[in-house]
Structures are given as C-alpha cells and as structure tokens.
Amino acid sequence: MDSLIVRPLNEDDYEQVLMEWWRQWGWRAPMRDFLPDNGKGGVMVLDGEVPVCAGFMYLTNSKVAWVDWIISNKEYTDRSGRKQAIKLLVDSLTNVCKKSGAKYAYALIKNESLIKTYEDVGYFKGDSYAHEMIKPL
C-alpha cells in the first residue's frame, strides 16, 4: 500500500469508476441526480493511483449532514488497506460536514463491518430500521 490520498469526486468518477464498483458488488447504482451535487458531492480515497473507495455527504437546511453511499473497489484486494481507506473516507466526509457547519452526521447503513468503521470514528448506533423508502417524484 502506498500513501492514501483523499480527493473530491469529479465529473467523470460516477461513469468511469463508481458505476463499475456498484456493478462489481451486484448492487443497483443510485441515479446520478439522486446523489449530492449530481454525483460530485463526496470524496474518493486512492492508494497511490488506484481508486479504493468513495462516499457522499448531503448537506441539509438543518444542522444535520448525511454521510452515506460508501462504495469500494472490489478488485482492490489488500483487505487491511481497504479497511484503512474506508476509515479515512468516513472520517474525511465527516470532517467536511463539520467544516460546512453541520453539528450532527447521520448515516443509514446495514453492513456490520461498515457499522464498526463508523463507530471507530465516533458514530454511535441510533434506532434500527427495517426498510428504506424512496419515491421518485
């Protein structure tokens, strides 16, 4: 593992990187316009030149920011490196939210390993939920 680099998402990342990652994991990708800033409202962590993971943050009209849509490169096989990169990702997204004026960071996650990562950077479990409900308008 080289040094980890955090950079903002750019215009090309959704089509050229993230769509492939969602496909690798067998997940349905969110529509680009469902994501903050049309798919650019987040950051990516790279190991040198290799993209490892990315995530998004929604800033709201309250003091709450939503840190979510964490996705990683399934072909990046350094498990320890992936764990470190995802922790850096969640921490970086949370810090951007704080610098943007949010007082609380919120996330909806189901994956136990990811829940542990969020806890490692200071999140605590709230209520559990059964289903996400979305309605296109």
Predicted regions and their residues:
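A short helix-loop-beta-strand connector motif used in the catalytic cores of GNAT acetyltransferases and
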Residues: 32-44, 53
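Conserved acetyl-CoA binding element of GNAT-fold acetyltransferases
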Residues: 63-81, 131
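Conserved beta-strand-loop-alpha-helix junction that forms the acyl-donor binding cleft
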Residues: 105-116
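Conserved active-site tyrosine of GNAT-family acetyltransferases
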Residues: 117-123
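Conserved acetyl-CoA-binding loop-helix of GNAT-fold acetyltransferases
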Residues: 79-95
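Short amphipathic alpha-helix that is part of the acyltransferase structural core
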Residues: 1-31
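Conserved catalytic-core motifs of GNAT/GCN5-like acyltransferases
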Residues: 108, 124-137
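Conserved beta-strand in the GNAT
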Residues: 49-59, 65-68
